[in-house]
C-alpha cells in the first residue's frame, strides 16, 4: 500500500504505524541532514566539514571585582579537538574576605576537569581545617578529589546533569530490582585526568596549590615571580619517583612546523595510553595502581605543592593559566605584556583575551585568570632592618616571593623550589611540613651561615654562596672553595717589597694565593 505525503513516497504496512523499522531510521537521517544544512554558521558543521583545519577562536570571558581585587577570566578552545579546560573564579567564597581561583587542564576528556571546577572549592570549604589551617585543608582537597573519582560514577552526574540530576537515583532503583543479576564493577577513570592550579586569597594572605603544569605567576613591580613549578617527568626528582613506582619515562621536545607546534619526542610513561607530559594530576588511575606505595609515591600523584605568603602593596597582579599560554610565552613575557598594557590604560578584559590569543599556536586549549590587586588595599612592605653588622651581606633575593613571611611546602623534591631562581629551601619529606623562608636570613643547617650576594668588583663570593661569619679573624670564607683550615690567629701576608715586580708600573702582580675576600 503506497501513501503520498508531500513529495516523498514511502511504504506503509497495513498492520503498523507509518514510521517503523527502516522507514523510521531513514526519516531520522533525513531530518539530521536538513538540520545540518540549516546550521550553516554553526561550529559543529564547520568542524565536521573542515576537521581541525581551522581553530575555534571564540572566547568566553567574565569579570568581577570588589574593593580589594578585580579578576578577569577568559578561555578559548583554539586548535584542540574539544574543550578540555575548566576554571572556577569565586570572588566571595565565604564571609571572611576569601576569594578562590582555579584552572584545570583536562586530558583524555573534559569530565575530570569539569568535576574539579565544580567540586574542588566545596571540598576545601567542607574540610575541618578550613578556618584554622588553610594549607592543610587545600592539600586534603586534592586527595579528596581523587577519592571521589574512585568511589563511584556519581561524580559524572555533576558534570553532565541529566533529568535535573535525578538520573543517578533512577539508575540505582532500576539496578536494585535487577539485583539477582551480576552487577558491573565500577572502574575509575584510567586515562582521564586533569591538572589543578588553585589560589586562595584570604585577608592579606595568599595560598597557592598546584599539581601538574598549569602555572601561577606573580608580578611585583614589573618583575615575574613563579609561585608554582611545573611537574614534569624530565625533572630529576619526579623521574626518580616515576621509576621507583615501576614506570619508565621518555623525553619530549617540540618543533614548529607551518606555524603549529608538533610533538617530536614526548615525555610520558610506557604503560600510559596516549602518554601525558606531566607527573602529577587528579585522576589517571592507570598510573596509580601500585598497591605497595602510598598515594604520594605513585607513578602519577595528586600530591600538591603548597605556597603561603603575605600580600603587600608592591604586588600588582597574578596570572593563573593552563599550559596553552606557557608553551609560547615565558613568565616574564606575560608579566611584561600585562604590565605595559595596564600602563597604557587598556582594560583588564582586553588584556586577558590577548593573553589567551597568545596561546593559539600551542595547539592546545588556553584558559587565563588575571587577578589585579587594587592600590592601597593591602599593607605596605615593611622596611628591612639594617642595624646589624651582617645586614650588608644579606641577599635581598633569598625570599622567592619577596615578602617577609613566606612559606613553601614541597613534599617530594628537595630541589623542587617554588621559584627556581631563588635560594629557597624546600622540604624533602612527604609529611606536608612547611619550610619557613625569611627575607633577612636563611637557615642552612647552622645559625652561623647566611646568604651573601655577589660583588664582582671586590672579589666577594658568588651569588648565593654560603659563608661562615663566626671566625675569630673576622674574615668570611666561602664553604664552596678549597681553603686551608681555620686558624685561631689572623693570617699573615707578605710585604709588598718582598713580591717580585715584573711590570713597569711596579705594582704587585695578581696572585690568587693572597686573595682577601
Swiss-Prot record:
> Composition bias, kind Polar residues: at what positions?
402-414
Q: What cofactors are annotated for this protein?
A: Mg(2+); Mn(2+)
Please tell me which top-level EC class this enzyme sits in. hydrolase
What does the record give as EC number? 3.1.3.16
| PPM-type phosphatase domain boundaries | 70-373
Please tell me where Mn(2+) 1 binds in this chain: 105-106
Bias type Low complexity, positions: 438-455
Q: Which PROSITE patterns match?
A: PPM_1, PPM_2
Annotated keywords: Hydrolase, Magnesium, Manganese, Metal-binding, Protein phosphatase
Name-wise, this protein is Probable protein phosphatase 2C 20
Amino acid at each position: 500500500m503506497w501513501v503520498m505525503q508531500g513529495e516523498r513516497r514511502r511504504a506503509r504496512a497495513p498492520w503498523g504505524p507509518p514510521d517503523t523499522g527502516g522507514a523510521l531510521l531513514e526519516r531520522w537521517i533525513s531530518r539530521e541532514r536538513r538540520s545540518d544544512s540549516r546550521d550553516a554558521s554553526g561550529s559543529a558543521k564547520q568542524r565536521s566539514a573542515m576537521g581541525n583545519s581551522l581553530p575555534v577562536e571564540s572566547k568566553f570571558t567574565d569579570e568581577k571585582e570588589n574593593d580589594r581585587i578585580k579578576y578577569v577570566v577568559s578561555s578559548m578552545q583554539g586548535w584542540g579537538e574539544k574543550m578540555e579546560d575548566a576554571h572556577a573564579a569565586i570572588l566571595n567564597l565565604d564571609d571572611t574576605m576569601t576569594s578562590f581561583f582555579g584552572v584545570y587542564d583536562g586530558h583524555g576528556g573534559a569530565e575530570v576537569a569539569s568535576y574539579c571546577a565544580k567540586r574542588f572549592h566545596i571540598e576545601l570549604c567542607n574540610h575541618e581545617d578550613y578556618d584554622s589551617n588553610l594549607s592543610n585543608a587545600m592539600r586534603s582537597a586534592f586527595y579528596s578529589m581523587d577519592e571521589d573519582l574512585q568511589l563511584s560514577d556519581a561524580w559524572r552526574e555533576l558534570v553532565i546533569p541529566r533529568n535535573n540530576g535525578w538520573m543517578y537515583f533512577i539508575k540505582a532503583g532500576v539496578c536494585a530490582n535487577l539485583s539477582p543479576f551480576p552487577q558491573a564493577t565500577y572502574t575509575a577513570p584510567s586515562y582521564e585526568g586533569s591538572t589543578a592550579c588553585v589560589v586562595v586569597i584570604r585577608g592579606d594572605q595568599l595560598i597557592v596549590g598546584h599539581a601538574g603544569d598549569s602555572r601561577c605567576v606573580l608580578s611585583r613591580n614589573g618583575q615575574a615571580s613563579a609561585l608554582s613549578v611545573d611537574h614534569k617527568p624530565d625533572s630529576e626528582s619526579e623521574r626518580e619517583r616515576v621509576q621507583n613506582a615501576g614506570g619508565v619515562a621518555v623525553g619530549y621536545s617540540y618543533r614548529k612546523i607551518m606555524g603549529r607546534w608538533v610533538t617530536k619526542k614526548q615525555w610520558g610513561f610506557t604503560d600510559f595510553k596516549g602518554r601525558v607530559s606531566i607527573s602529577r594530576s587528579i585522576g589517571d588511575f592507570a598510573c596509580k595502581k601500585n598497591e605497595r606505595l602510598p598515594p604520594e609515591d605513585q607513578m602519577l600523584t595528586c600530591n600538591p605543592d603548597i605556597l603561603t605568603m603575605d600580600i603587600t602593596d608592591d604586588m600588582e597582579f597574578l596570572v593563573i593559566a593552563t599550559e596553552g599560554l606557557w608553551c609560547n610565552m615565558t613568565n616574564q613575557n606575560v608579566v611584561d605584556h600585562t604590565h605595559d598594557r595596564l600602563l597604557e590604560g587598556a582594560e583588564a578584559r582586553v588584556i586577558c583575551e590577548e593573553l589567551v590569543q597568545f596561546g593559539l599556536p600551542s595547539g592546545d586549549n588556553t584558559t587565563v585568570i588575571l587577578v589585579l590587586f587594587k592600590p592601597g588595599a593591602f599593607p605596605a612592605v615593611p622596611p628591612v632592618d639594617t642595624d646589624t653588622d651582617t645586614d650588608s651581606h644579606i641577599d635581598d633575593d633569598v625570599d622567592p616571593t619577596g615578602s617577609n613571611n613566606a612559606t613553601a611546602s614541597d613534599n617530594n623534591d628537595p630541589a623542587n623550589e617554588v621559584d627556581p631562581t631563588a635560594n629557597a629551601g624546600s622540604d624533602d619529606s612527604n609529611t606536608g611540613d612547611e619550610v619557613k623562608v625569611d627575607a633577612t636570613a636563611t637557615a642552612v643547617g647552622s645559625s652561623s651561615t647566611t646568604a651573601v650576594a655577589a660583588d664582582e668588583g671586590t672579589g666577594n663570593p658568588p651569588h648565593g654562596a654560603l659563608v661562615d661569619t663566626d671566625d675569630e679573624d673576622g674574615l668570611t670564607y666561602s664553604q664552596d672553595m678549597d681553603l686551608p683550615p681555620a686558624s685561631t690567629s689572623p693570617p699573615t701576608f707578605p710585604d709588598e717589597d718582598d713580591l717580585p715586580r715584573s711590570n713597569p708600573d711596579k705594582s704587585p702582580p695578581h696572585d690568587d694565593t693572597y686573595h682577601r675576600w
